[in-house]
Amino acid sequence: MTITTTVKAKTLAVNNKNAPHTSATMHPRNVHRNGYPMSALCQSYPTLEAHVIKAKSGQQSIDFSKAASVKALNAALLIHYYGLNMWDIPEGYLCPPVPGRADYIHGLADLLAKDNKGVVPTGNRVIGLDIGVGANAIYPIIGSQTYGWDFVGSDIDDVALKSATTLANNNPKLKPLLAVRKQHDKAYIFAGIIQPDDHFTFSLCNPPFHKSAEEAAMGSLRKVKGLGRNKQKSNNTGNAQPITANKLNFAGQSNELWCDGGELAFIQRMIKESVEYQSQVGWFTCLVSKSLHLKAIETSARYFGAKQFMKVDMGQGQKISRFVAWKFRD
């Protein structure tokens, strides 16, 4: 089924494919479902060409252990698929994998369709609140350019807010659909951001997962070791070099990676605070990295009066992720 609507004088077509969506596959509407067309990406963003290598399979790829290569791939994907003129982030800030972030947006679209007679709502009548928009502004980019949604992005970090603003100002297709707001008080998530006259269709969030800087470092080290094993397996010459911490691709500021109590405490705080804004936000949603936290999160949502609670699974190959959603209305 194809849904066609007019979005700010632009026709937006959303292809609702009938392909099955399992926990091991990307969403059927995810344009990254079939991998990276490197030749086309290099045409859209020539800088990527210097980072392209040949994998053991014979296919073109990049070295995912190199931050510059991953950043170039992200820029190419966002320019090629999402109509940007440019994309960049300051050094040391989170460089998110685009396909997984797109899955969250498509999962949200399906969630909103449940309240819209099974039809994905499109256009700027849908307004999303991105808690922690980051320097990359990845969710507003994908959501606005795929479905025409409007976004407000919040953050506590001045550099991140400046970067997100720069991205909007340098991309005419994004600028009218993204506004940023600073959270001045780290103790709050919604307070100070949601204004009395605001009404959001949904909120979304990629929370800080870890409890401390030490735990975040350990998690990054595990990823480094995993990349090292994969690189040695796929290296053609047998001269694979060890991947060390200073080659780490998993960048991110402290507020992007960890907070006191980790993701469980953060999401429970979000649930508690969401009660005050239940009439101004349709669906509250948040990514959850650890499945063992799900029961406690649902218990908290029910305790604070959520009438609906959902878990939406997402899959990118061997990686399984999910987001939770709750609302206070039937």
Curated annotation (Swiss-Prot):
Keyword Methyltransferase assigned: yes
Similarity comment: Belongs to the methyltransferase superfamily. METTL16/RlmF family.
SUPFAM superfamilies for the chain: S-adenosyl-L-methionine-dependent methyltransferases
Pfam families registered for this protein in UniProt: Methyltransf_10
Keywords: Cytoplasm, Methyltransferase, rRNA processing, S-adenosyl-L-methionine, Transferase
Cell compartment(s), UniProt: Cytoplasm
Gene3D superfamilies: Vaccinia Virus protein VP39 (3.40.50.150)
An MF annotation (GO) of this entry: 23S rRNA (adenine(1618)-N(6))-methyltransferase activity
Protein name (Swiss-Prot/TrEMBL): Ribosomal RNA large subunit methyltransferase F
Native species: Pseudoalteromonas atlantica (strain T6c / ATCC BAA-1087)
HAMAP family per record: 23SrRNA_methyltr_F
Catalytic reaction(s) noted: adenosine(1618) in 23S rRNA + S-adenosyl-L-methionine = N(6)-methyladenosine(1618) in 23S rRNA + S-adenosyl-L-homocysteine + H(+)
EC number annotated for this UniProt entry: 2.1.1.181
PANTHER family listed in its UniProt record: RNA N6-ADENOSINE-METHYLTRANSFERASE METTL16, SAM-DEPENDENT METHYLTRANSFERASE
Gene Ontology BP term (one): rRNA base methylation
Job of this protein: Specifically methylates the adenine in position 1618 of 23S rRNA.
Enzyme class: transferase
Cellular component, GO, one term: cytoplasm
